[in-house]
Design a protein with these regions (language model features):
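P-loop NTPase catalytic core of nucleic-acid-dependent motor ATPases
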Residues: 14-35, 132-135, 146-267
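Generic detector of short, locally flexible boundary/turn motifs and exposed helical patches
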Residues: 103-114, 120-123, 179-184, 230-238, ...
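Conserved AAA+/SF3 P-loop NTPase catalytic/coupling segment centered on the Walker-B
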Residues: 266-276
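Intein modules and their embedded homing endonuclease domains
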Residues: 1-166
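Generic detection of long, well-ordered alpha-helical segments
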Residues: 35-42, 46, 105-115, 173-176, ...
Length: 276
């Protein structure tokens, strides 16, 4: 019952998949988190407590208006019932007692054991397939809207897109000339190379593999390699990620599966430069 009540109030904000567990819609994208669903449950319990206290207040005021003495409410349940004079007082007392029972129930549920069990019981009601998340590889989510990379058209962010990531930047021409000057510095004004890198970055913004590319930024130190790629990674926000360079080598002997699992849904992954 409590799990259904929770989902009735928060169905639009919570989903669950087996690999990710709970995700919460934060207004911009679906955020994977163990703590946010707990916060949702705590907010739900706070609302229930406020509702119970309001019912107690309303039913108490009704009893007083019907002439019931406050001392009568301090009696044992049977004596309290016997003290009521007429059907109206009895009905008001039943409402008052039900409201107190409701509040006592809510107070008993305000602990982590109950919160976790309620969230677990709610799973079947908000269960989704992992394939539903980020299902359109051509959509990219930004702070001011979601853009279709095929058309360049933007629209308001929507929870129905099931997007789990967001960029740090919005489409804008602000600072464009500074960036163009930086590119000419990084790539020695080589237009063909700049055009190629632009294509690579464009491919990286798309959420599916159109071309299998491992880019190796080679060159002496302090020539802009890290500055360029770190800038792109910053723009892409949580669409980008990092990986240890040794995990890409054949001779890596440690377990890299957890590290690789963290890359799910990333569109650009950067490894620090190797020693050789």
């Amino acid at each position: 019952g409590e799990a259904k009540a929770l989902i009735n109030g928060y169905r639009a904000d919570l989903i669950y998949t087996e690999p990710t567990e709970y995700l919460f819609y934060n207004g911009d994208y679906w955020e994977e988190s163990k703590q946010l669903p707990v916060a949702v449950m705590e907010d739900f319990l706070d609302k229930q407590l406020a509702d119970a206290e309001k019912q107690i207040e309303d039913s108490y005021n009704l009893l007083m208006s019907l002439g019931v003495q406050e001392s009568d409410l301090m009696l044992t349940p049977k004596k309290r019932t016997d003290a009521m004079n007429g059907e109206a007082q009895l009905e008001a007392l039943q409402k008052y007692e039900a409201a107190n029972t409701y509040k006592n129930f809510v107070m008993r549920t305000r602990n982590m054991k109950y919160i976790n069990s309620t969230l677990q019981a709610a799973v079947p009601m908000v269960l989704h397939k992992i394939s539903e998340l980020d299902h359109d590889p051509y959509l990219i989510n930004t702070p001011d809207g979601t853009y279709d990379l095929r058309t360049g058209q933007g629209r308001a962010n929507s929870k129905d897109d099931f997007i789990t990531k967001q960029t740090n930047a919005i489409p804008s021409d602000i600072g464009k000339q500074i960036w163009l000057d930086a590119l000419n510095t990084f790539f020695l004004a080589d237009k063909e190379l700049i055009d190629y890198v632009q294509k690579v970055v464009g491919l990286a913004a798309i959420g599916c593999v159109l071309s299998e590319i491992l880019v190796i930024a080679y060159g002496d130190g302090r020539n802009g390699k890290s500055t360029f790629w770190n800038t792109i990674a910053h723009v892409l926000g949580i669409y980008s990620g990092a990986i240890s360079a040794d995990s890409l080598t054949v001779g890596c002997k440690r377990n890299v599966k957890p590290e690789l699992a963290e890359l799910k849904g990333k569109r650009l992954v950067i490894a620090a430069e190797l020693e050789e």
